[in-house]
UniProtKB/Swiss-Prot annotation:
SMART domains: FBOX. Residues 7-56 form the F-box domain. This is Probable F-box protein At4g22165. It holds the Pfam family Beta-prop_KIB1-4.
């Protein structure tokens, strides 16, 4: 008896079955499966894999002929690197300054800023950095230098952070304007808005529509952007070699990173920030800390992640790196540093690398 093969039946699987399959796919297979047909793309928008995935993005060298590509590393698949293509001719000449979900905040050599979705290639251009609303005025001069209203200074775009809604594409981008203040721009803005009383910027994290701000003079603020600005300010003690981190539940932490030359290893101390000062924490519990992103995640929700650990990469800092092409985790329970992965790439490539947590619902 002759069998009737219909080549189109594979795209007509029940939606409930497709939904179950999509929830069990890895990141790369998820992206591949949703591009098969319109039906599968529609299903992909309604579900995400059961576990969050953390990826490290490796940028191409500037002189690479294939400079519109990048590579993705998944710690759960240590022997694989996935290649992303057609990211634009400016991609290799731009630097990633921050990540949120599947989006990258990119800066080119002339300080032009834009947001790029690594999977959909959607690009959003941001206002010129010299377009400022506030007391500090900036003028772009010849050769793309900048002149400040208080005189000539080297331009500093410090520790930018951002948030974007995957569906509406509403966004807010913030960065430190040298020692002067923090500035921000939302969707529809044509200029950067300067935030008063945010001078001597040191570090900041944006989470749940709140900006956690730490100054070099010891001032800690929480600025609420969900409504009109409701500034909450408390004084804290400042230490060197620190990083501001916000936990899953919204608690503010200060993470101190220390180099031990005798053992040629890094060590960390974690402190909870409160109105009375710092409280040392001996454990992150079931959470893992991504130092580059300034956040914690539930380790059980991220493939390949270990609880109570700090994930970090070596970056040039006074020549103290063990190997600038290595990726590490620090276990707070054992107080030991573990080599997570050794990359076959240049120190500059790893220095430019960034962790990101892709959002798979609307990409």
């Amino acid at each position: 008896m002759e069998k009737n093969h219909n080549p189109n039946t594979w795209s007509e699987l029940p939606l409930d079955l497709l939904n179950l399959v999509f929830k069990r796919l890895s990141l790369v297979n998820f992206q591949r499966a949703k591009s098969v047909c319109s039906t599968r793309y529609s299903v992909s928008r309604q579900c995400v894999p059961e576990r969050q995935i953390a990826l490290l993005i490796l940028f191409p060298k500037e002189d690479n002929t294939d400079n519109s590509t990048c590579k993705l590393f998944n710690p759960d698949e240590k022997d694989k690197l996935y290649k992303m293509q057609d990211l634009g001719v400016e991609f290799a000449k731009s630097v990633c300054r921050a990540t949120y979900g599947s989006w990258l905040l990119m800066q080119d050599s002339k300080y032009h800023l834009y947001i790029l979705n690594i999977f959909t290639r959607k690009r959003i251009n941001l206002p010129p950095v010299e377009s400022q609303l506030g007391m500090v005025k900036i003028e772009r001069t010849i050769y793309d230098w900048f002149h400040f209203s208080h005189g000539h200074y080297s331009f500093s775009l410090s520790s930018p952070v951002f948030w974007i809604d995957e569906e509406s594409k509403d966004y807010i981008v913030m960065w430190g304007l040298g020692v002067y203040c923090v500035v921000y721009a939302k969707k529809g803005d044509t200029s950067w808005n300067q935030i008063p009383q945010t001078s001597y910027f040191y570090d900041m994290v944006y989470k749940d529509h709140k900006l956690y701000f730490l100054s070099s003079t010891g001032t800690f603020q929480i600025l609420d952007f969900s409504e009109e600005m409701d500034n909450k300010t408390s004084k804290v003690v400042c230490l060197l070699d620190r990083k501001l981190v916000v936990t899953v539940t919204g608690k503010a932490l200060k993470v101190a990173k220390m180099w031990r030359p005798t053992y040629r290893t890094w060590s960390f101390r974690v402190f909870k920030i409160s109105s009375s000062g710092y409280e040392k924490l001996d454990s992150l519990g079931d959470e893992a800390l991504l130092l580059d992103l300034g956040i914690t995640v539930l380790a059980s929700d991220v493939e390949g992640f270990k609880r109570n650990s700090i994930y970090f990469s070596c970056r040039p800092s006074g020549g103290y790196e063990t190997n600038a092409s290595d990726l590490f985790l620090f276990n707070l329970e054992t107080q030991k540093m573990e080599l997570l992965h050794k990359f076959d790439c240049s120190s500059l490539q790893l220095y430019r690398s960034r962790w990101f947590l892709p959002s798979l619902t609307h990409t």
